[in-house]
Amino acid sequence: MSKILKIAIPSDDGVTVKTSLCSSRGYVVATIISVVIVHQEMRWNLLSEIMTACDGRYYNLHDCTHVIFHVISERRREILTGKGIEVLLTDNNSVNVALADFLATASAYEHAKQIA
């Protein structure tokens, strides 16, 4: 049985990777099974949720396994890894290219596991 991965990327428009987590209007969240994107959605950061949810600005990441950023502070990295979310970095501005890079890496990893 394949593991389900949920990858979040901060974005204001669903197309461009946002450089700052704090000012991001939301996240593109992709559900991946067997190195294939089976669902993709935009989750908006609503002020009401940020102000009232237990996790504040991280409420949209509650079911995510990975987050892809341009830059992240050590403190935010610690918070996310403490929640069990793996933090990855990209130098791509395109959400689709960042996801494709992730899938290529995941595919190579799965292939290496099968050979070993």
What are these regions (language model features)?
Residues 1-56, 62-63, 82, 90-116:
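Non-catalytic interface/targeting segments
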Residues 69:
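Glycine- and other small-residue-rich loops at beta-strand/loop junctions that grip anionic moieties
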Residues 72-78:
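Short, glycine/polar-rich helix-capping loops at beta-to-alpha or helix-loop-helix junctions
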Residues 78-84:
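Short helix/strand-capping connector loops at secondary-structure junctions
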